[in-house]
Amino acid sequence: MTDRDTLFSAPIASLGDWTFDERVAEVFPDMIQRSVPGYSNIISMIGMLAERFVQPGTQVYDLGCSLGAATLSVRRNVHHQGCKIIAVDNSPAMVERCRRHLDAYKAPTPVDVIEGDIRTIEIKNASMVVLNFTLQFLEPDNRQLLLDKIYQGLNPGGALVLSEKFSFEDASVGELLFNMHHDFKRANGYSELEISQKRSMLENVMLTDSVEAHKARLHKAGFEHSELWFQCFNFGSLVALKGGQA
């Protein structure tokens, strides 16, 4: 049982920028389930993708791992010898709780949980990399550099899973899906005040891209194939493949 997210239920006099601090980490499972449509589906399908792409003796990277939901999904579905998962997050509160969550679910595949900057983590011998709602929090100038590094660190036949909140080039579509997302949050018990205050805190730190912009970056990084495999309203996930045989 996780704590319910009531962080923004009362007026906040001075809304700063969003941070993944202790208070957010404490309610994060409830927050993300009630805020991100399709999140549970994406997490479970990441495990299925891992079963298909992860190879013996290779590494899996979960970059921006938060509390380790994607890492747990991968670990449940990887049964090869010599594999290791490297989970990275720059939030001390998230890392601490992630380690506790992983310790509670024993499995043969080892996991290294690292408190650090995903932009400086070395990526090597990777059969799969996960960026699950992470890239949107990087400065735009750093996004291509990270994707370039991921491509270089992936083995031939490896896969990148990139989940994001999207913007849309068609303003009418963007408005519709934006409103549907807000209906989703209201249906999950968030008030107008909670929705408004959280949006104000996120607007300077979460900068979204269109699916087309993501695909262009992935192509520039060297990925031979990329496609949207899941979408619910303005949230979704792409898979990008490095050519060659695993």
Curated annotation (Swiss-Prot):
Functional summary from the UniProt entry: Catalyzes the conversion of S-adenosyl-L-methionine (SAM) to carboxy-S-adenosyl-L-methionine (Cx-SAM).
Species the sequence originates in: Enterobacter sp. (strain 638)
UniProt-listed HAMAP family: Cx_SAM_synthase
GO biological process terms, semicolon-separated: tRNA wobble uridine modification
Classification via CDD domains: AdoMet_MTases
EC identifiers of the protein: 2.1.3.-
Gene Ontology MF, one: carboxyl- or carbamoyltransferase activity
Protein's recorded name: Carboxy-S-adenosyl-L-methionine synthase
Membership in a protein family: Belongs to the class I-like SAM-binding methyltransferase superfamily. Cx-SAM synthase family.
Assembly behavior: Homodimer.
The reaction(s) this protein catalyses: prephenate + S-adenosyl-L-methionine = carboxy-S-adenosyl-L-methionine + 3-phenylpyruvate + H2O
Keywords linked to the UniProt accession: S-adenosyl-L-methionine, Transferase
Enzyme class: transferase
